[in-house]
């Protein structure tokens, strides 16, 4: 399902006065003695704070592991992956997720999305109910809340030969609607130009012309591109998968983050 529009030193100086050698020596002894008396409590305080952070991290880690649904595993996503012949590209330690499929016509479809962004999208159940009851769809009071529910999804489709052109579609996915809005369609001279993740390649992609706003295109062209994407598996089921997998991966990444933090503070 596709949507057509989105309203978018201290500077300090210290003066010292020369003092007799005997007095200076006495002052140093006094200072060292005091510093020794203060050091131990300060060290204890630091150790206590370190231990406190470690204990909290351990507690949070325990809670997260205990509340993990037993049925949640990568296997739970196999129905969708097998149906559309998508393969999951595992990216441990990264926000970005990727799934890939090869079509019967020899095209390769890459779908990229940010699991942290999607897992933290607000979801307003009340607004969802209001939308269902409103025959005209979303009213003005709900529009601002709805616009906060969009996440970026990038779909890159390439031909069989690596030297052939590729097209990158920048999409906005709405969690509540299970729908996609095409923001732009950008052609590239090769797969490498579209997918290379080097800093130089990313800068080049930022500078390239991305075409006019999708909504400014001829309506028939819009419809045909949307139908093309749907035929490649960009549909409500993909939106549901992206939402569910993002929750799964983001939670696993959070547990991994807690474990790494705990190692430092313990």
UniProtKB/Swiss-Prot annotation:
Residues of the transit peptide: 1-47
Localisation: Mitochondrion matrix
GO MF annotation terms: mitochondrial ribosome binding
Residues with Phosphothreonine modification: 91
GO BP annotations, alphabetical order: aerobic respiration; cytosolic ribosome assembly; mitochondrial ribosome assembly
Cellular-component GO terms for this entry: mitochondrial matrix; mitochondrion
Pfam family, one: MAM33
This protein's UniProt keywords: Mitochondrion, Phosphoprotein, Transit peptide
Primary site of residence: mitochondrion
Record carries keyword Secreted: no
Listed InterPro entries: MAM33, MAM33_sf
Further facts: Present with 4910 molecules/cell in log phase SD medium.
Family: Belongs to the MAM33 family.
Quaternary structure annotation from Swiss-Prot or TrEMBL: Homotrimer or homotetramer.
Role: Not known. Binds to the sorting sequence of cytochrome b2.
Protein name: Mitochondrial acidic protein MAM33
Organism: Saccharomyces cerevisiae (strain ATCC 204508 / S288c)
Taxonomic lineage from the root: Eukaryota, Fungi, Dikarya, Ascomycota, Saccharomycotina
